[in-house]
Amino acid sequence: MNNMSLEMLEKLEAKVQMAVDTISLLQMEIEELKETNESLTAEANELRSNRETLAQDNDKLQNDHQAWQERVRTLLGKMDHVE
């Protein structure tokens, strides 16, 4: 009986150790996933910021282009009056 109890205890101990090892591995995996998530979040924020900057630059260039077109039209209008 004592021998059987010892064997059961050893099996239980092995199962507990396996569970502890599995939990440790899962915790490490969670940490890696958290780091990956933080990295991807930072990258997404940077891309969002870059997109906003590009949109602002695009708006400015379009406004500059319209202003130049207006100046050219004005100059052409003045030239028409001179002729």
Swiss-Prot record:
Pfam families membership: ZapB (PF06005)
Coiled-coil annotated residue ranges, if any: 7-80
The keyword Cell division belongs to this UniProt entry's keyword annotation: yes
Chief subcellular location: cytoplasm
Claim: Kinase is one of the keywords in the record: no
One BP annotation, GO: FtsZ-dependent cytokinesis
Keywords from the UniProt entry: Cell cycle, Cell division, Coiled coil, Cytoplasm, Septation
Annotated InterPro entries: Cell_div_ZapB (IPR009252)
GO annotations of cellular component type: cytoplasm
Record's subcellular location: Cytoplasm
Family (UniProt): Belongs to the ZapB family.
Function: Non-essential, abundant cell division factor that is required for proper Z-ring formation. It is recruited early to the divisome by direct interaction with FtsZ, stimulating Z-ring assembly and thereby promoting cell division earlier in the cell cycle. Its recruitment to the Z-ring requires functional FtsA or ZipA.
Subunit structure: Homodimer. The ends of the coiled-coil dimer bind to each other, forming polymers. Interacts with FtsZ.
Protein name: Cell division protein ZapB
Source species: Photobacterium profundum (strain SS9)
